[in-house]
Amino acid sequence: MTDNAGAVQPPTRREEARWTRATLGRDGQPLDLLTARFDRHRYAPHAHDEFTIGVCVGGSEIIDYRGGHIRAVPGSIVVLAPGEIHTGGPAACDGYAYRALYAQPSLLTEAVVGPPPHFREPLLDDPALAAALRTAHTELSACPDPLEAESRFPWLLAALVRRHSTARPDRDEIPGAAGVAAVVRDRLAGELQAPPSLADLATDLGLSRYQLLRAFRTAEGIPPYAWLAQHRVQRARRLLESGLRPAEVAGLVGFADQAHLTRWFRRVLGVTPAAYRTSVLPGRQGAAPVLTAAQQRSRRAGAGRPRLPV
């Protein structure tokens, strides 16, 4: 890089960190999420009260832990136990980037029996789990919906513990899974704007939160937050057809805002709420047809191109 006089300037260093606090269900316990990108930053020796679960997403980091050195590279998972001193910094000149979550120990005991889990190896190679953790972290950092956070993070942490710790897994089969799912569906649909936490539902059913999640997934094939989002989309359709605007509809069906509604509406139906409303309102003969997201992108890409003579 050069300035106006032609002198070489050093590259801009990136030292970025952003904290997001998600809540696991309505009035539930907090779960802190860190998104970090550092070129030179080196942590002082420290410890956390929580388990630190990190996924490296760029560069490489050297972590001093338990008297040794861990080298985290993209796709690797690092698990640091509560109360254990560690530090970290760049392994090379390209810095390092990672996503981390800070989980109370109780969160990692829901899918096991006996003593709390112990991770003999702090550096884990599990590409599928790393990708799932990264995706959940990214999406919940952008829009920390309580039910979605409670549906996704305890499930992923259970997978982490069951695959990689010394703890003994709890039973997989949940008797009466269909009945459990029916109760959960009814409660979520009945309290659309402020759904109950899964922890409270599990207590009412005499289950752990992990057992409730497993039962629901067994019966429905999707987690509770995804079922509720689809139910909200169907309710939103009816309200849009009645003439209400997307911004009004979002709050009425329990989405955080119009952007949250739009994200799920497109996932389920392939179009935006505004486009759907335009197409289905009564008396709008000749209205533009509803286009899928791909068709909308194609039309925008083609706008402005000269038309060929016929």
Where are the predicted features?
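N-terminal regulatory/effector-sensing and dimerization cores
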Residues: E16-P117
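Solvent-exposed, amphipathic alpha-helical segments
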Residues: A128-A142, V180-E191, R235, L239-S242
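Amphipathic alpha-helical segments enriched in hydrophobic/aromatic residues interleaved with Lys/Arg
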Residues: V112-R171
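Sigma70-family region 2
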Residues: T87-A91, R163-H164, R217
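Terminal helix-turn-helix DNA-binding modules in bacterial transcription factors
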Residues: D186-G190, A194-A199, L207, T218-Q258, ...
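Helix-turn-helix
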Residues: L201-R209, L213
